[in-house]
From Swiss-Prot:
The record marks 187-188, 238-239 as: Cleavage. This is Assembly protein G7. The keyword Repressor does not apply. Belongs to the chordopoxvirinae G7 family. It comes from the Viruses. Its main location: host cell. Induction: Expressed in the late phase of the viral replicative cycle. Keywords: Host cytoplasm, Phosphoprotein, Virion. It holds the Pfam family Pox_G7. It comes from Variola virus (isolate Human/India/Ind3/1967).
């Protein structure tokens, strides 16, 4: 019985975004291609050709082009993907040939079989290149973080370094792009100019973790009419860098803020008149859950987010595949890979000629000098 291929939750999300961004403006059910795309992470070299051929065959069977205007619209979307194709000559040969076919309607109609074959090849070229690049970076990240050949102290240090590196990536790169703020250039007064990409990422990791960007983002969303009260995910993910106090201390203040009404000041009630018992319990439950995560009582790693999978813009913040394309997901994966490499270099043990001593600690060993 063949061993089951390893799967990656991160790559499942990334691959779906890539497929949907490439196939935008094309009338095709992308579910089959998405399922094939997921197989390219941790995929043996012997199977990659079969998976990519499956993607091409699906395109060949399902893609239809009705007129040259539709083709031009598709090409406008595909043009930006040229940066992620390893052989740009291949890309531009196919792309420019398709452009030529839009010269006249008669020429387009006569050559439609050739147009479809060329377009299917171009789409497969883009998808396979982007997916393989993404798979390679995700595999590197996961293997680096999951490596078993590390001491517990090194593993702990690397996980924490990576956690806060990703928080800085969100705070100093992604959130400013979402709200249109200037992106802060990493680096400090008196340091040498940044000479390479790794140094830029290193300085990004050194920037202060506590910033006002999350609150600024909430203000931006509130001005756009989006409800920002569902922020438990930001606490759990570590973006909301604040201490969570006892529920009893702040519950009245939280509820009065949400209600946006005057509090009845009497001996019997400190809650707003238009807040019912059910709403009070929901607020209490939300803060209790946040407190449990903050104190480590719950360590399942689950994070529910207001960012995806919801129907109403007034309650949640929808991020589509086209938005992910705008945020250049492969570039961010590359930044994460460089971060992981920098963290690895920083925490790698160096042979100092000492003696390994076993102790009764969860960390198990320490290094001592030879005496």
């Amino acid at each position: 019985m063949a061993a089951e291929q390893r799967r990656s939750t991160i790559f499942d999300i990334v691959s779906k975004c890539i497929v949907q961004s490439v196939l935008r403006d094309i009338s095709i059910n992308s579910e089959y291609i998405e399922s094939k795309a997921k197989q390219l992470c941790y995929c043996p070299a012997s199977k990659k050709e079969s998976v990519i051929n499956g993607i091409y065959n699906c395109c060949e069977s399902n893609i239809e082009i009705m007129d040259k205007e539709q083709l031009l619209k598709i090409l406008d979307n595909l043009r930006c993907h040229s940066a992620h194709v390893c052989n740009a000559t291949d890309f531009w040969r196919l792309y420019n040939s398709l452009k030529r076919f839009t010269h006249t309607t008669a020429f387009f109609n006569t050559c439609k079989p050739t147009i479809l074959a060329t377009l299917n090849t171009l789409i497969t070229l883009i998808l396979s290149n982007k997916l393989l690049y993404a798979a390679e970076m995700v595999e590197y990240l996961e293997n680096q973080l999951d490596s078993s050949n590390k001491s517990m102290s090194q593993e702990l240090a690397e996980l924490l370094e990576m956690k806060y590196a990703l928080i800085n990536l969100v705070q100093y790169r992604i959130l400013p792009m979402i709200i249109g703020e200037p992106i802060i250039v990493a680096g400090f007064s008196g340091k040498e100019p940044i000479s390479n990409y790794s140094a830029e990422v290193e300085r990004l990791m050194e920037l202060p973790v506590k910033t006002d960007i999350v609150n600024t983002t909430y203000d931006f969303l509130a001005r756009k009419g989006i409800d920002t009260s569902n922020n438990i995910a930001e606490y759990i993910a570590g973006l909301k860098i604040e201490e969570i106090e006892k529920v009893e201390k702040y519950l009245p203040e939280v509820i009065s803020t949400i209600a946006n009404s005057n509090i009845i000041k009497n001996k019997k009630s400190i809650f707003p008149a238009n807040i019912n018992d059910k709403q009070i319990m929901e607020c209490s439950k939300m803060l209790d859950t946040s407190e449990k995560y903050s104190k480590g009582y719950k360590t399942d790693g689950a994070v529910t987010s207001p960012l995806t999978g919801n129907n109403t813009i007034t309650t949640f913040i929808p991020i589509s595949a086209s938005d992910m394309q705008k945020f250049t997901i492969l570039e961010y994966l590359y930044i994460m890979r460089v971060m992981a490499n920098n963290v690895k270099k920083k925490n790698e043990g160096k042979n100092n000629g000492g003696v390994v001593m076993h102790i009764n600690s969860p960390f198990k060993v320490i290094n001592l000098p030879k005496c």
